[in-house]
């Protein structure tokens, strides 16, 4: 069973990266407390949780946000007296960054979000259809979304490096600040 801890609503409502991270951790802690109150053993929660964050086109900041999420989760587990478990993290390209006036530019925005998700360490990267802002995505939009991830992985080798942003001054500093 997978339990989703999702902070995309904070992002899509205009929240900052710090607010999105705060919402994510608050959602996780609230879910754990509710499960505990209902009699469940919360020690199993970390390995059953799927954390979901939105990623926008500002890839430097988005990479740092994803890295900060992992650090924050480790601190939450420590504060609750639980063993540190790897965080299953999903990155979903932002709906608020998509425009209906020029949907073709959304391909570039989605590519930046896909890059941020991959380099930021997301286990699952989901790219929205570039024409989603116009209504129900058409076949071309869905196919492009799927292929964006494949091209990023195969052509640029994003999946071949364990931690491409590790040690980068900007990413480490911003992740710490967040």
Spans of model-derived segments:
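Anaerobic metallocofactor- and corrinoid-dependent redox/one-carbon enzyme cores
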Residues: 1, 9, 90-99, 107-110, ...
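Short glycine/threonine-rich loop-to-helix capping motif typified by GTGT followed
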Residues: 15-21, 56-68, 94-108, 135-145, ...
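Extended, hydrophobic alpha-helical segments in both membrane/secreted and soluble proteins
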Residues: 66-72, 76, 91, 110-114, ...
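Glycine-rich and small/hydrophobic secondary-structure elements
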Residues: 28-33, 103-122, 144-153
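Inter-helical turn/loop segments and adjacent helix faces that build the functional surface
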Residues: 38-43, 77-81, 135, 159-164
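Catalytic alpha/beta active-site cores
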Residues: 1-58, 80-90, 118, 124-128
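Active-site or pore-adjacent capping/gating segments
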Residues: 112, 123-178
């Amino acid at each position: 069973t997978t339990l989703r801890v999702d902070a995309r609503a904070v992002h899509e409502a205009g929240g900052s990266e710090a607010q999105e991270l705060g919402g994510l951790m608050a959602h996780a802690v609230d879910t754990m407390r509710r499960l505990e109150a209902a009699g469940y053993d919360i020690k199993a929660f970390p390995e059953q949780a799927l954390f979901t964050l939105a990623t926008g086109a500002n890839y430097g900041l988005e990479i740092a946000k994803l890295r900060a999420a992992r650090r924050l989760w480790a601190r939450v587990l420590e504060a609750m007296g639980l063993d540190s478990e790897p965080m299953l993290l999903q990155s979903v390209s932002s709906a608020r960054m998509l425009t209906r006036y020029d949907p073709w530019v959304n391909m570039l925005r989605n590519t930046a979000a896909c890059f941020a998700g991959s380099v930021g360490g997301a286990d699952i990267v989901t790219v929205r259809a570039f024409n989603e802002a116009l209504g129900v995505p058409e076949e071309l939009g869905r196919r492009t979304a799927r292929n964006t991830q494949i091209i990023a992985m195969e052509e640029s080798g994003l999946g071949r490096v364990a931690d491409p942003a590790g040690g980068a001054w900007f990413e480490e500093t911003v992740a710490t600040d967040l």
